[in-house]
From Swiss-Prot:
Start-end of Basic and acidic residues biased regions: 1291-1300
Protein name in UniProt: Probable inactive protein kinase DDB_G0270444
Top-level taxon: Eukaryota
Coiled coil listed as a keyword: yes
Family classification: Belongs to the protein kinase superfamily. CMGC Ser/Thr protein kinase family.
Pfam name, any one: WD40
Listed Acidic residues bias regions: 1301-1311, 1331-1354
Keywords: Coiled coil, Repeat, WD repeat
Biased composition (Low complexity): 959-979
Organism (species): Dictyostelium discoideum
PROSITE patterns membership: PROTEIN_KINASE_DOM, WD_REPEATS_1, WD_REPEATS_2, WD_REPEATS_REGION
Length: 1360
C-alpha cells in the first residue's frame, strides 16, 4: 500500500487535492491552499467553488462556481478569466449563454481543428466542455470566452444564435473521443450518450447501467470507454458499437486512469481504493482484474489525483483530511519508459518481481534492438500510443550513440544477434507456457471480484433480534425478487407528500389577488415546483441506491452462505468434489494441497465463522437501512426549510398564503405540511379564548399563541351566505333551505348559550356554508325536475368575537356589524338575547328579495339614527322596560341617554308585522310571527332558543298545526306579559307622570292602554278555546293510541309466531342431526365392542385348542395320561359352562343397558314434544351428551367389566385350587386302579375309542354354538380373563408332571370309576348345550325385535 501520509486544513471542507512539482494543492469552497515542505499559502476564489479540475498541459485550474460561471486560475492561484467573458451589466443574453444550474463536470480539449465545429472560431487550439445540472453540455472557446455549441437530447427550443438551450437530466460525467470527435456524457438518469462534436446531435447511447447517476467516464488507451455508476458497477464499452465488453461490480465514487500503466484507481464511499487492471487474454477477450484493495481507514473519498511520474495518489476524503499514498502500484516510471521492460512487466504481471527480466545494454547494435522489439511486439500487441517529449529525446540520444558504435562492433553484433535470437525464442516459449498456466489457475482458483464492499466493523447497535429479522427479510427478497416492497413505507409517503405540497403550493400562488405581481408569482411558482422536483429526484436516487445495495448484498457469496446455508454448502461441496476428481485425474500429488483448500473453504460454514458472516451480512443490511433513514430525515428537514423559505410558517407547520377573501382582514389561506390538508388561519391579538366544539362550529385544529398574537388554525370554508344567495335564481333561497339554515343556527346558539357563551357579532359574513346537491324526484313536475335541491351545512366562525357571559367586553376586539346588533349592544351589554336579535336580522336577510336587500333594515349615520330606525320597525319600548334594562346592565351615561331617547320617540303608526312584511314581502305568516318574536326591543320579551326551535315555521308544520302552535305560544307570551303589565295602577302612574308632553304623545298612550285591555280579553277567550282543544286532542290521542297498540300487538304476535316456527324448524333439524349422530356413534361403539369380544373369543378358542393338542400328544405318548386328559377336559368343560353363564349374565345386563338407553331416548322424545323448542335445544343436547356418553358408556361399562373380571378371577382361582386337589387325589386313585385292572385293558381300549368319538361330537357342537353366540351376543372384555385362564393351565401342567411320578397302581383302580363319571357328565353337557341353544335363539329374537323398535323410534324422531 505504500506510505500513507495525512494532513488537514482549517475552515471549509476540501473539494479536491493535487500533487505536482513537489507542491500539494488543496481546493476548498473558499479557494486554493498551497503546501510544500517549508511554507503554506492561501488564494481565495471569486465565488464559492462547486467543482474543479487541474489542466496539466495548460498548468491551470478550471473551476465551476456558485454563480454558474466558469473561471480559470494559474497554478499559483492567480485569477485569469471567466467563461462566458461578459461585461458587468447582466442582461437576458447572459442567462441564455451561461449555465442555468451548478456545473458538475469540466473537460478540456486540445489539438482539434475548430473550423470543423464553427466557422466563426479563430485558430485557437484550446476548448473546454462543461456539463451542468441544467442538463446541457456547453463547448467554450477558452481564449475568447465565447460559447460555441450546446449539446442536448431535446432540440425543440433554439435561441436566437442557433444554440440549443433546454433542460433535461443533469450532466454528471463527461469525456471526449478525439479519434471519432465524439462528446460522451453521463447523466443523472443513468444513461450514457455520445454526441457528434460537429453536428451536435446524439449518435447513440450506451445501455446497461441500471437506474442511477453516472459517476465517472474515462477513455482508455485502447480506445474503450470506462464508466461507473450508482448501480455499483464498473463497465467497459466499445465506443463504435455501444456494446458492453466486460465489467465488474464495485462502487466507484471517483475514478482515475493511468495511460502509461493501463491501471484504474476506483475509490469508494467506504474509504477503500481498488487497483484494477485492464487485461486482454490470448482469446482477445477483455477483463477487469482487481489487483489489490487499499484500505485507507477513511470515510467516503471525494477526489483522487494520481501523479504517474512519482507513482503517488493524493486522496481527498469527505472530512478535512488529505491522504498521500506513495508507491501506489509499485511500478516505477523508468520501467514504463522502456518498451522492452514494459512488455515483460505486462506478461509477467504487475505484482511479480523483476529479477529475471531481459535487458539490452547500450553496446548492442541497432539491428539486435530492432529484432528484439519486433519479437516483443508479437508477444503483446498493446503498446503505448503516446510518448512524452522526454522519452523521444532519450531515444534520439540512444540512436546517435548506437550509430557511432555501429562501425566498431559489426563483428560482435553478428555473434550477439544469433545468441539473442536463440535466447528470445526460448524465453518466448517459457512466457507462453506461463501465460497458459496462469490462465488455467485464474479460471480454477481465482476468486471472483466481489461487487459489494463490506464494512470493516460490526455496529454495536446490531442485536440478535435484528439479525434474525434482517436474514428473514433478505430471504424473502431473494425468493420474491421484489426488493422495492422492502422499502420503508415513509418513502412512498414522502413522494405523495411532495405531490400534495406541489398542489397546495400552486393553489396558494393561484390565489394571489394582485395582478401587478403575477410575473413575480409565476417565477416563484416555477422555482417552488423545481425545488420539489429536485427533492423527488433525490428520493428516487436514494431509493435506487438502497435497492442496488440490497441487490448486490444478496448476490454476494457471504449472503448466499447465510441465506441458503444448506444449498450453498451442498453446491460448494459438489463443486469441490468435482474439482477433487479433476485434480485426482490430472495429478495425484495435488490431493494434499487441495484438501487444505477444502478445509479452508468449508471453514466458513463452521460454528465459529458462520455467526461472524451472518453478523456481517446483517450489519450491512442494518447500515443500509440506517443510511436510508438518515437520508429521509435530512430530506424531511430540507423540505421543511424549503417550505418555510417559500411561505411564512406558524409553529413550523402551517404555511400561510393570501387572505381567504376580499372582505377578510385577519383570516389567511394556509396548508398543514404534516397532515397535508388546506386550513384557514385566524390572527387575533393576545386575548383569552374559550373555543367550544360543535358540529355547526368551524373545527379548530390547534391554537398557537405568541406574545404578540394568537393564531387559530381551523378548517377552511367554501362559501358564506352572501355568495350562496347570489348564486340562486333571482337571489332568492328556497324556504326549505331557509328553514335548514335557521334550524342549524338555532341549535348552534343553543349549544353556545348552554356553555355560557355569546356570539355577539352574528352576521351573514360569519355564517360559513358547505353545500351538496341532490337531484329532484321523477314524480315532480318537469320544471322542478330541472332544478337541484341543495343541502346546506352551516358553520359559524370568528371566535375572536365570541365571549363568555362573565367576561369584560372592553377587553375584546370590536368589529363592524352594528347593523345586525341588538339595541342593548349600544350600551355595551351582552347577553343571550343579543344573539336572538342578530339571528332575526339574518332571518330577514334570508327571506328578502334582491331589491329588498338593497335597502338595509336598520340604518343610520350614528347611534341615534340607528335607534330611530329600530323603533320605527319593531315599535317603541315602555319606560319601565328601559328602566329594567338600565338596572340590569352596567351602562355608561351615553348608553342610558340613548335608551331614554328610544323611550321618548313617538309610537310608529303601523304595526311591527306590517313593517316587517314591507321589508320581506315573500315571508309567510308563520315566518313573520317568528320574526316579530325575535325582533323585540326589550331583551327579556324576545323568544327563547328552545321556543324558536319548536316554532311551526322551524318545524315546517301544516297551516292548521301552525295556527295551533302559534296560539299556544301567544298564550304563553300573554301570560308572561300579564305578570309584567298588570297591576294597571303602575301603568296609570307611568301615564300620569307624562302629562306635560304633547297631545299626540298622550293620545298614543291612551291607544296603547285600549290595545292592552283588548288583548287581555282576547287572550282569556283564546285560553278557553285552547283548553277545550287540548282536551279534545287528548281524547283523540288516547283513542288513536289504543288502536295503534292493538295493531302493534297483533303484528308483534304474528312476528313472534313466525319466528317461533322458524326456531322450531331449526331446533327440529338440529335434534334430528344430533340423534342421528348419536345413534350412529352408539352403533359404532357396540360394533367395536362386539368385534373386540369376537377377537377375544377367538383367542380363547386358540388357547383351548392348544390345550387340547397338548393333552392329545400326552395321551399318545403315555397311555397313563389318557384318563388325565379326560379329567382335564371335564375341568375345561366346567370352566366353559361357568364362562357361558357369566357371559349370559353380562349379555343380559348389556341388553338391560340398551333398553335403558332406549327408554331414555323415548323419554327425551316425549319431553321434546311437550317442552318449548328453546328449552329442547339445551336440555336434549345436555341429556344426550351427559347421560348416554358419560353415564351409559363409561360408568356402566367400567363397573360391569370390573365386577365381572373380579368375580371371574376369584371363582377361577377357587375352582382351580379345588380341581387341582381333586385331580391329585383322583390320579393317585387311578394309578392304584390301573395296577389292579391290568386285565381290563381290552375294555379300556373300547372305552377310549368311544370317548374320542364323543369328544369330537362335543367339539363340533361347541364350535357351531360358539359361532352363533359370537355373532349375536355382546360380551365384556376378556383380555384379563385370558390372562387369568393361563394361571390354571400352568397349574395343571405342574400337577400333571407331579402325578407322573406317582404310583401307577392307583391309576388302574380308579379308571372304571372315571369312565362312569364321564358318561354321566357327557349326558349333562348335552342337555345343557340344548338349553343354551334355546336361550340363544330366544335372545336373538329379542334383539331383533329391539332393533326393529329402535329403528321405528328413530324414524319417529326424524319425522318429529
Amino acid at each position: 500500500m505504500g506510505n500513507q501520509q495525512s494532513s488537514g486544513i482549517e475552515g471549509s471542507k476540501p473539494i479536491s487535492a493535487f500533487y505536482y512539482n513537489n507542491i500539494s494543492t488543496v481546493i476548498s469552497r473558499d479557494g486554493f491552499y498551497f503546501f510544500n515542505n517549508q511554507s503554506q499559502r492561501f488564494e481565495s476564489s471569486k465565488r464559492p467553488i462547486t467543482f474543479v479540475i487541474y489542466d496539466e498541459e495548460g498548468n491551470q485550474f478550471i473551476t465551476g462556481e456558485d454563480d454558474f460561471f466558469i473561471r480559470l486560475y494559474n497554478e499559483d492561484g492567480t485569477y485569469i478569466k471567466q467563461l462566458p467573458n461578459l461585461q458587468s451589466n447582466i442582461t437576458t443574453d447572459v442567462i441564455a449563454i451561461s449555465h442555468q444550474d451548478f456545473i458538475r463536470v469540466l473537460f478540456p480539449i486540445r489539438n482539434i481543428d475548430f473550423h470543423q465545429i464553427n466557422s466563426n472560431s479563430n485558430n485557437s487550439n484550446t476548448m473546454l466542455l462543461s456539463g451542468g445540472m441544467d442538463g446541457t453540455i456547453r463547448l467554450w472557446q477558452v481564449e475568447t470566452g465565447s460559447l460555441l455549441a450546446v449539446y442536448n437530447q431535446d432540440i425543440s427550443k433554439v435561441t436566437m444564435n442557433g444554440i440549443i438551450d433546454t433542460t433535461s437530466a443533469g450532466i454528471t460525467a463527461l469525456t471526449f473521443d478525439p479519434t471519432n470527435l465524439l462528446v460522451i456524457s453521463g447523466t443523472s438518469d443513468g444513461i450514457v450518450r455520445k454526441h457528434s462534436l460537429r453536428e451536435r446531435v446524439i449518435m447513440g447511447t450506451f445501455i446497461g447501467h441500471s437506474r442511477g447517476a453516472i459517476l465517472n467516464l474515462l477513455l482508455t488507451k485502447h480506445g474503450h470507454l470506462l464508466s461507473s455508476s450508482m448501480d455499483r458497477t464498473i463497465r467497459l464499452w466499445d465506443i463504435d458499437s455501444g456494446k458492453q465488453i466486460t465489467g465488474c461490480k464495485y462502487f466507484s465514487q471517483t475514478m482515475v486512469y493511468d495511460h502509461h500503466r493501463d491501471i484504474v484507481f476506483a475509490a469508494s464511499d467506504t474509504g477503500t481504493i481498488a487497483v484494477i487492471q485492464i487485461v486482454k487474454d490470448l482469446n482477445n477477450s477483455w477483463s477487469l482484474k482487481k489487483i489489490k484493495v487499499l484500505d485507507l481507514k477513511k470515510p467516503a473519498i471525494l477526489h483522487l489525483h494520481y501523479n504517474t511520474y512519482v507513482d503517488q495518489l493524493t486522496v481527498t476524503s469527505i472530512e478535512t483530511n488529505i491522504a498521500s499514498v506513495q508507491n501506489a502500484t509499485g511500478i516505477p516510471f523508468e520501467s514504463v519508459e522502456n518498451d522492452y521492460k514494459k512488455q515483460v512487466n505486462l506478461v509477467q504481471g504487475l505484482w511479480e518481481t523483476t529479477n529475471n527480466r531481459l535487458t539490452i545494454t547500450p553496446s548492442q547494435s541497432n539491428n539486435s534492438l530492432a529484432k528484439s522489439q519486433s519479437i516483443n511486439n508479437q508477444l503483446n500487441q498493446s503498446t503505448t500510443s503516446t510518448i512524452n517529449q522526454q522519452q523521444q529525446q532519450q531515444q534520439q540520444q540512444q540512436q546517435q550513440q548506437q550509430q557511432q558504435q555501429q562501425q566498431q562492433q559489426q563483428y560482435e553484433d553478428e555473434f550477439e544477434d544469433e545468441y539473442i535470437d536463440n535466447q528470445i525464442k526460448e524465453k518466448q516459449q517459457q512466457l507462453l507456457q506461463q501465460q497458459q498456466q496462469q490462465q488455467q489457475q485464474q479460471q480454477n482458483e481465482e476468486e471472483p471480484i466481489e461487487d459489494y464492499i463490506f464494512s470493516n466493523e460490526i455496529s454495536s447497535e446490531l442485536t440478535e433480534e435484528f439479525i434474525q429479522l434482517s436474514i428473514e427479510e433478505l430471504k424473502n427478497i431473494k425468493l420474491t425478487n421484489m426488493i422495492e416492497n422492502t422499502l420503508n413505507s415513509d418513502q412512498m409517503i414522502l413522494i405523495d407528500r411532495l405531490k400534495q405540497l406541489e398542489f397546495l403550493g400552486n393553489e396558494l400562488f393561484e390565489h394571489q389577488s394582485s395582478q401587478e405581481e403575477k410575473e413575480y408569482n409565476e417565477a416563484r411558482k416555477l422555482k417552488y415546483v423545481n425545488g420539489l422536483t429536485q427533492f423527488q429526484d433525490s428520493i428516487e436516487e436514494m431509493s435506487e441506491d438502497y435497492v442496488s445495495c440490497m441487490r448486490m448484498l444478496i448476490k454476494t457469496n457471504d449472503a448466499d452462505i447465510v441465506l441458503d446455508t444448506d444449498n450453498c454448502k451442498d453446491i460448494k461441496i459438489r463443486s469441490l468434489e468435482q474439482k477433487r476428481m479433476e485434480i485426482l485425474e490430472r495429478h495425484r500429488l495435488e490431493l494434499e494441497q487441495f484438501q487444505g483448500e477444502v478445509d479452508r473453504e468449508l471453514s466458513v460454514f463452521s460454528d465459529q465463522q458462520l455467526p461472524l458472516i451472518t453478523k456481517k451480512v446483517a450489519n450491512e443490511c442494518f447500515e443500509n437501512k440506517k443510511r436510508l433513514l438518515n437520508s429521509q430525515e435530512s430530506i424531511e428537514k430540507s423540505i421543511q426549510t424549503y417550505l418555510s423559505n417559500t411561505f411564512p410558517a406558524v409553529n413550523q407547520r402551517y404555511h400561510l398564503g393570501p387572505l381567504i377573501s376580499e372582505n377578510s382582514t385577519t383570516v389567511f389561506r394556509a396548508f398543514d405540511c404534516k397532515s397535508l390538508i388546506p386550513v384557514a388561519v385566524k390572527v387575533l391579538p393576545p386575548v383569552a379564548l374559550n373555543i367550544p366544539v360543535h358540529e355547526n362550529l368551524t373545527k379548530v385544529y390547534q391554537v398557537c399563541q405568541t406574545p404578540q398574537s394568537i393564531y387559530v388554525i381551523m378548517e377552511p370554508s367554501t362559501t358564506s351566505l352572501k355568495p350562496l344567495v347570489e348564486s340562486m335564481d333571482q337571489h332568492q333561497l328556497p324556504i326549505s333551505m331557509v328553514i335548514s339554515i335557521m334550524k342549524q343556527l338555532l341549535q348552534c346558539l343553543l349549544f353556545l348559550h348552554s356553555s355560557s357563551l355569546v356570539y355577539r357579532d352574528l352576521n351573514p359574513s360569519r355564517v360559513l356554508l358547505t353545500t351538496t346537491t341532490t337531484t329532484a324526484n321523477d314524480d315532480v313536475d318537469c320544471e322542478l325536475q330541472q332544478q337541484q335541491q341543495q343541502q346546506v351545512k352551516v358553520k359559524l366562525t370568528h371566535f375572536g368575537i365570541m365571549r363568555s357571559l362573565q367576561g369584560n367586553v372592553d377587553s375584546e376586539p370590536a368589529e363592524d356589524g352594528m347593523i345586525y346588533g341588538s339595541p342593548e349592544i349600544f350600551g355595551r351589554v351582552i347577553n343571550t338575547e343579543s344573539d336572538i336579535w342578530s339571528l332575526g336580522v339574518i332571518f330577514i336577510y334570508l327571506l328578502q328579495t334582491k331589491q329588498e336587500r338593497t335597502k338595509p333594515l336598520f340604518h343610520g349615520h350614528n347611534n341615534k339614527s340607528v335607534i330611530e330606525s329600530i323603533v320605527k320597525i319593531v315599535g317603541r319600548p315602555f319606560q319601565k322596560d328601559i328602566d329594567r334594562m338600565i338596572a340590569n346592565g352596567n351602562m355608561t351615561s351615553d348608553a342610558i341617554q340613548l335608551l331614554q331617547y328610544a323611550a321618548s320617540l313617538p309610537v310608529p303608526f303601523e304595526d311591527s308585522i306590517d313593517n316587517l312584511r314591507s321589508h320581506c314581502s315573500l315571508a309567510s305568516d308563520s315566518a313573520l310571527d317568528l320574526l316579530t318574536q325575535m325582533l323585540q326591543f326589550v331583551p327579556h320579551k324576545r323568544i327563547s332558543i328552545e321556543q324558536a326551535l319548536s316554532h311551526p315555521f322551524i318545524l315546517n308544520l301544516p297551516k292548521q298545526q301552525q295556527q295551533q302552535q302559534q296560539q299556544k305560544q301567544q298564550q304563553q307570551q300573554q301570560q308572561q306579559q300579564q305578570q309584567e303589565i298588570i297591576p294597571k295602577d303602575d301603568s296609570l302612574t307611568d301615564i300620569s307622570s307624562n302629562k306635560q308632553e304633547t297631545v299626540v304623545y298622550d293620545a298614543n298612550i291612551q291607544i296603547n292602554q285600549e290595545d292592552l285591555i283588548s288583548k287581555i280579553k282576547e287572550n282569556e277567550i283564546q285560553k278557553e278555546i285552547d283548553f277545550k282543544e287540548n282536551q279534545i286532542n287528548e281524547e283523540i290521542k288516547e283513542d288513536v293510541k289504543e288502536e295503534i297498540e292493538e295493531d302493534i300487538k297483533e303484528e308483534i304476535k304474528e312476528e313472534i309466531k313466525e319466528e317461533s316456527k322458524e326456531v322450531q324448524e331449526e331446533a327440529k333439524e338440529e335434534i334430528k342431526e344430533e340423534i342421528q349422530i348419536e345413534t350412529q356413534e352408539v352403533k359404532e361403539e357396540i360394533k367395536e365392542e362386539v368385534q373386540v369380544e369376537i377377537k377375544e373369543e377367538k383367542i380363547k378358542e386358540e388357547i383351548k385348542e392348544e390345550i387340547k393338542e397338548e393333552t392329545q400328544e400326552e395321551i399318545k405318548e403315555e397311555n397313563k395320561d389318557e384318563i388325565q386328559e379326560t379329567i382335564k377336559e371335564e375341568v375345561q368343560v366346567e370352566i366353559k359352562e361357568e364362562i357361558k353363564e357369566e357371559t349370559q349374565e353380562e349379555i343380559k345386563e348389556i341388553l338391560n343397558e340398551v333398553q335403558v338407553k332406549e327408554e331414555v331416548k323415548e323419554e327425551i322424545q316425549e319431553e321434546v314434544s311437550q317442552e318449548t323448542l328453546s328449552e329442547i335445544q339445551e336440555e336434549v343436547k345436555e341429556e344426550i351428551q351427559e347421560d348416554i356418553k358419560e353415564e351409559v358408556k363409561e360408568e356402566i361399562q367400567n363397573e360391569i367389566r370390573e365386577e365381572i373380571q373380579n368375580e371371574i378371577r376369584e371363582e377361577i382361582k377357587e375352582e382351580i385350587k379345588k380341581v387341582s386337589e381333586e385331580i391329585q387325589n383322583e390320579i393317585q386313585e387311578e394309578v392304584k386302579e390301573e395296577i389292579q385292572n391290568e386285565i381290563q385293558e381290552e375294555q379300556q381300549d373300547t372305552i377310549k375309542e368311544e370317548i374320542q368319538e364323543i369328544k369330537q361330537e362335543i367339539i363340533s357342537e361347541r364350535d357351531t354354538n360358539q359361532e352363533g353366540e359370537i355373532s349375536d351376543t355382546i360380551v365384556s372384555d376378556s383380555k384379563e380373563a385370558d390372562s387369568i385362564i393361563e394361571g390354571p393351565v400352568t397349574l395343571e401342567r405342574d400337577n400333571k408332571n407331579a402325578s407322573d411320578h406317582d404310583d401307577e397302581q392307583q391309576f388302574v383302580e380308579e379308571e372304571i370309576e372315571v369312565e362312569e363319571e364321564i358318561e354321566v357328565e357327557e349326558e349333562i353337557e348335552v342337555e345343557e348345550e340344548i338349553e343354551v341353544e334355546e336361550e340363544i335363539e330366544v335372545e336373538e329374537e329379542i334383539e331383533v325385535e329391539e332393533e326393529i323398535q329402535v329403528e321405528d323410534d328413530t324414524d319417529k324422531s326424524n319425522d318429529f
